[in-house]
Amino acid sequence: MEASDSMKEDLAKAILAQIREEEIVAMSCDVVNIPSPTGEELEMGRYMRRTFEEAGLSVSWQEIEDGRANVVGLWEGTGNGKSLMFNGHMDTSNTGRETFLTGLGYKPKAVIRNGMIYGLGIYNMKGALVCYTQAVKALMRAGVKLEGDVTIAAVAGEIEKTQWSDEFIGKEFRGYGVGTHHLVNHGVLPDMCILGEPTDMQLVLGHYGTVWVRISTHGHYVHTAFTRGKQDHSSIFRMKEILAPIYEWIAAWEKKATYDGQPGVVNVGCIRGGHPWRVSRTPDRTDVFLDVRVPPTMPLKEVRISVKQLVLDLRKKHSDYGIEYETFVSVPGAEISKDHQLVKTIESCHQRVLGTAATHATVLWDSDASVMTRFGIETLNYGPSSGPRDAEGEKVAIETLVNTTKVYALAAAEICGAH
């Protein structure tokens, strides 16, 4: 039976009254103070397991590999209503050990200053894990019963990293959705999902995917003394010769990859060649690595087809350069209809909490929505942040965390049939 509008208003007020800022702040500091770079999520997982158990959730521990696990907290509904998952990654964008990142927000040590919480992971995306947990606790304290299930999944290995060759191997390189892949491959299949990536409380209805590409030139391994007049035999020289055509390809691709009025983007993320410990030798191979962003409406294979044609054209012009390529990451984009129930619900709850209409966005970054969408789990990115990261590093306003928690709590109540 549908509740009356007055009952809904009373229920909303009861739920919001149970959201406690001091608990949000305390948990935020706790999670920031636990270092959890990719591959080192174990202690963070143990913390989330204890927190879920103390909240009264049914907890599953999904071991991915030695020292890494997903933690899944389930609040089972009283019926068979719509089920909702809150999903967030525990690994952080950086390790906290980088010497060139000196801002306090790049360190796994929480600092509260001027209404902001600073610290590694608070922005991406431990703050969202806090909001999920505190939203569910508020619903429970309010005495709410739900028809559908609510799940909180704290996952490992989302950050954009991958193993490559025999040089970069190990769990610290196994990211790009490894945790959420394991999650959905092992039975966690809700009707829909809220993903609290740092969107600054905008509704991200679409985001790009990516393909990572390596293009290489080969040359001759020669002592410096014998290189006079033979500089064009160096793989670095040969890479220089093909960089201009590569950048021309990039410009064309970015135009082709336009989505929702926004052009695509390609990052030249790395160039490497030679031997820094032995520069008395010419390099036999030089590599350039590209991060090619792909709209969710375009098949990923379009990158391979286009890059292959580029390489074929380069080989015709430079037949002795030994040009080769590979694609070694492929992650699709994701989108959700503006008319989906989840989108409409978040819009309504955002309006109720903030008093202003929510805005929509299309972004060039990728998220685990790529994984869940392919498993039939409609996913919306909507989460806390307080502007882009800068020299100070990661930070989120306490007010933003509180407001996001309120929106999550009301959305779960609406979607899962609170009574």
Model-derived segments and spans:
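Metal-dependent amide/peptide-bond hydrolase catalytic core
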Residues: E2-A12, R214-H419
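Acidic/His- and Gly-rich active-site-bordering loop/insert found
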Residues: E2-I122, M140-L146
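Residue-level signal for inorganic ion chemistry
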Residues: V31, P35, E197, M239, ...
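Alpha-helical metal-binding/catalytic segments enriched in His/Glu/Asp
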Residues: F86, V111-W164, I215-G219, G229-I250, ...
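Acidic-glycine-rich active-site phosphate/pyrophosphate-binding loop
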Residues: T95-R113, G206-T217, T345-C349, L380
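Short glycine/proline-enriched loop/turn "hinge" motifs that connect secondary-structure elements
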Residues: L101, V144, V204-T210, V279-P283, ...
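Acidic/histidine-rich catalytic neighborhood of metal-dependent amide-processing enzymes
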Residues: M125-Y208, C416
